């Protein structure tokens, strides 16, 4: 391992281990818990003392997926929550079989905004060719379940 690779590894680890603040001021755990492997890196402290600079520690940690498992019920709840929070949808008219255009009165631009909100909620991109077919909350639930391999 070259010095450049070691330096990059150290800076990545330092950035990963630094606690991050969210808007509310609460400290959250950084992505260190999501790392699959850690490599040999120098001991990190706020100020590296002369003693620690030449020493190396090997940390062997293996963690698996940080994503909570999805279920159809959870996908259903999340889709309906996102739609209820959309200001152009009347929550009293909303159910899983409501058609976005015919029942809820949305136009094509609103439909695009709904699809973008679903992309943000579930963390993956929905291609335009697929988005055109998602005209009901039930269609979105089925699409997300298929994409995330959720079968019940």
Swiss-Prot record:
GO cellular component: mitochondrial [2Fe-2S] assembly complex; mitochondrial inner membrane; mitochondrion; respiratory chain complex I
One of the GO BP terms on file: [2Fe-2S] cluster assembly
PROSITE patterns: CARRIER (PS50075)
Keyword field: Electron transport, Fatty acid biosynthesis, Fatty acid metabolism, Lipid biosynthesis, Lipid metabolism, Mitochondrion, Phosphopantetheine, Phosphoprotein, Respiratory chain, Transit peptide, Transport
Keyword Nucleotide-binding among record annotations: no
Domain Carrier: 73-148
Positions where O-(pantetheine 4'-phosphoryl)serine occurs in the chain: 108
Pfam families according to UniProt: PP-binding
Subcellular location per the Swiss-Prot or TrEMBL entry: Mitochondrion
One GO molecular-function entry: acyl carrier activity
InterPro entries from the UniProt entry: ACP, ACP-like_sf, PP-bd_ACP
Annotated function: Carrier of the growing fatty acid chain in fatty acid biosynthesis. Accessory and non-catalytic subunit of the mitochondrial membrane respiratory chain NADH dehydrogenase (Complex I), which functions in the transfer of electrons from NADH to the respiratory chain.
Subunit structure: Complex I is composed of about 45 different subunits.
Listed NCBIfam families: PRK00982.1-2
Family classification: Belongs to the acyl carrier protein (ACP) family.
Protein name: Acyl carrier protein, mitochondrial
Source lineage: Eukaryota, Metazoa, Ecdysozoa, Arthropoda, Hexapoda
């Amino acid at each position: 391992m070259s010095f450049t690779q070691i330096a990059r590894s150290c800076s990545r680890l330092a950035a990963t281990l630094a606690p991050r603040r969210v808007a509310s001021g609460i400290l959250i755990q950084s992505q260190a818990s999501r790392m699959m492997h850690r490599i040999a890196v120098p001991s990190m402290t706020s100020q590296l003392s002369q003693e620690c600079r030449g020493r190396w520690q090997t940390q062997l940690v293996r963690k698996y997926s940080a994503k909570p498992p999805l279920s159809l019920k959870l996908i259903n709840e999340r889709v309906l929550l996102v739609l209820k929070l959309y200001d152009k949808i009347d929550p009293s008219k909303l159910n899983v079989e409501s058609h976005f255009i015919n029942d809820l009165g949305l136009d094509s631009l609103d439909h695009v905004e709904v699809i973008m909100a679903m992309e943000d909620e579930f963390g993956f991109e929905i291609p335009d060719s697929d988005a055109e077919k998602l005209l009901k909350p039930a269609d979105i639930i089925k699409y997300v379940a298929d994409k995330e391999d959720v079968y019940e």
